[in-house]
Amino acid sequence: NNLKYLKWSYDSIRKNQGNHEVEICVADDFSNDGTWDWCLEMMNKDPLFKAIRNEGPTRLGHTILYDRLVNEAATNDICMIYHADMYLMPGSIDEIEKHLTDKTIVSLTRIEPPLHPDGPEKILFDCGIEPEEFHEETLMSYLQMSSKDRSNKTTEGIFAPWAFYKKD
């Protein structure tokens, strides 16, 4: 039940994937907001879009559906768990590939409004909460100004989005 976020997130991935061939695999956990219909439409339009659906009536939850996506839908060597309300920044996939090694997980830094407590895996910075309120220019300017401070910085915090090799 996150269709407006899913569309926004999909657009950000396609816009910012760079030269990478990105397969997008979506799990629909018995939604009722049109998400599954949109997924069916996207599978017809985008050959790198795949979706699985839990037919319900009981929801299965993220963990079970993530396992299904990785094992049943994904075909690329690198998998990334990504929530529907996330915006992929330019260069993110290059950074993942730069840091990813066997038996490791790479988590991108999240930049989000101060809705939840701070943590080592995120930066609190408000660029809008809803997709229609999102200020991409503000985010890009912030990243350009602060990129020198974070160059090659790693932390121990882990939360989505995270990437790993499918074989692991």
Question: What function would you assign to each model-found segment?
Answer:
Residues 11-21:
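Short, acidic, metal-binding catalytic loop of nucleotide-sugar glycosyltransferases
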Residues 89-167:
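Conserved catalytic core of nucleotide-sugar-dependent glycosyltransferases
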Residues 13, 29-30, 57:
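Conserved short acidic donor-positioning loop in nucleotide-sugar-dependent glycosyltransferases
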Residues 83-87:
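The conserved acidic donor/metal-binding loop of glycosyltransferases
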Residues 28-37:
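A conserved acidic beta->alpha catalytic loop
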Residues 79:
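Short aromatic/hydrophobic "clamp" motif used to bind/position activated sugar donors
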Residues 55-74:
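Glycine-rich, basic loop-to-helix element that forms the pyrophosphate-binding segment
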Residues 1-8, 30:
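Active-site beta-to-alpha loop of glycosyltransferases that engages the nucleotide-sugar donor
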